[in-house]
């Protein structure tokens, strides 16, 4: 078995949708990025790639490549899981934390978990997503951006 850790952060801007865990979260701002900027899925993808010593999402999906402009991060995550499968690994579990002062994310977590279970080819009881604030400290606390952390356990098939 292998363990991986992932992290991602994007700034909040007007004129973009807020996509987290593949869910369109109603909010007045969204995350800026080359793709849909889904920090949760990016952190999880990075954790999987790290666990399997396959680099990071910047290596596999560079922001300089126009084919990934506006990309759906769920498709990117499914590609990462296909790479894991080629190496003979499946997901053991994932534990992820979204760091955002606003909006409140608890109502959206069940749908995020369902999306992740589908994309990671895993039972939902192997998927945990939490959301926390920073008590108004730092960039997240000031509402400048949203971050996500993820830890995964990958197991041999």
From Swiss-Prot:
<keyword id="KW-0414">Isoprene biosynthesis</keyword>
<feature type="binding site">
    <location>
        <begin position="56"/>
        <end position="58"/>
    </location>
    <ligand>
        <name>4-CDP-2-C-methyl-D-erythritol 2-phosphate</name>
    </ligand>
</feature>
<comment type="subunit">
    <text>Homotrimer.</text>
</comment>
<keyword id="KW-0456">Lyase</keyword>
<dbReference type="GO" id="GO:0019288">
    <property type="term" value="P:isopentenyl diphosphate biosynthetic process, methylerythritol 4-phosphate pathway"/>
</dbReference>
<dbReference type="GO" id="GO:0016114">
    <property type="term" value="P:terpenoid biosynthetic process"/>
</dbReference>
<feature type="binding site">
    <location>
        <begin position="61"/>
        <end position="65"/>
    </location>
    <ligand>
        <name>4-CDP-2-C-methyl-D-erythritol 2-phosphate</name>
    </ligand>
</feature>
<comment type="function">
    <text>Involved in the biosynthesis of isopentenyl diphosphate (IPP) and dimethylallyl diphosphate (DMAPP), two major building blocks of isoprenoid compounds. Catalyzes the conversion of 4-diphosphocytidyl-2-C-methyl-D-erythritol 2-phosphate (CDP-ME2P) to 2-C-methyl-D-erythritol 2,4-cyclodiphosphate (ME-CPP) with a corresponding release of cytidine 5-monophosphate (CMP).</text>
</comment>
<feature type="binding site">
    <location>
        <position position="8"/>
    </location>
    <ligand>
        <name>a divalent metal cation</name>
    </ligand>
</feature>
<feature type="binding site">
    <location>
        <position position="42"/>
    </location>
    <ligand>
        <name>a divalent metal cation</name>
    </ligand>
</feature>
<keyword id="KW-0479">Metal-binding</keyword>
<dbReference type="InterPro" id="IPR003526">
    <property type="entry name" value="MECDP_synthase"/>
</dbReference>
<feature type="binding site">
    <location>
        <position position="142"/>
    </location>
    <ligand>
        <name>4-CDP-2-C-methyl-D-erythritol 2-phosphate</name>
    </ligand>
</feature>
<feature type="binding site">
    <location>
        <position position="139"/>
    </location>
    <ligand>
        <name>4-CDP-2-C-methyl-D-erythritol 2-phosphate</name>
    </ligand>
</feature>
<dbReference type="InterPro" id="IPR036571">
    <property type="entry name" value="MECDP_synthase_sf"/>
</dbReference>
<comment type="pathway">
    <text>Isoprenoid biosynthesis; isopentenyl diphosphate biosynthesis via DXP pathway; isopentenyl diphosphate from 1-deoxy-D-xylulose 5-phosphate: step 4/6.</text>
</comment>
<dbReference type="Pfam" id="PF02542">
    <property type="entry name" value="YgbB"/>
</dbReference>
<dbReference type="GO" id="GO:0008685">
    <property type="term" value="F:2-C-methyl-D-erythritol 2,4-cyclodiphosphate synthase activity"/>
</dbReference>
<feature type="site" description="Transition state stabilizer">
    <location>
        <position position="34"/>
    </location>
</feature>
<feature type="binding site">
    <location>
        <begin position="34"/>
        <end position="35"/>
    </location>
    <ligand>
        <name>4-CDP-2-C-methyl-D-erythritol 2-phosphate</name>
    </ligand>
</feature>
<feature type="binding site">
    <location>
        <begin position="8"/>
        <end position="10"/>
    </location>
    <ligand>
        <name>4-CDP-2-C-methyl-D-erythritol 2-phosphate</name>
    </ligand>
</feature>
<dbReference type="InterPro" id="IPR020555">
    <property type="entry name" value="MECDP_synthase_CS"/>
</dbReference>
<feature type="binding site">
    <location>
        <position position="10"/>
    </location>
    <ligand>
        <name>a divalent metal cation</name>
    </ligand>
</feature>
<protein>
    <recommendedName>
        <fullName>2-C-methyl-D-erythritol 2,4-cyclodiphosphate synthase</fullName>
        <ecNumber>4.6.1.12</ecNumber>
    </recommendedName>
</protein>
<comment type="similarity">
    <text>Belongs to the IspF family.</text>
</comment>
<dbReference type="GO" id="GO:0046872">
    <property type="term" value="F:metal ion binding"/>
</dbReference>
<feature type="binding site">
    <location>
        <begin position="132"/>
        <end position="135"/>
    </location>
    <ligand>
        <name>4-CDP-2-C-methyl-D-erythritol 2-phosphate</name>
    </ligand>
</feature>
<feature type="site" description="Transition state stabilizer">
    <location>
        <position position="133"/>
    </location>
</feature>
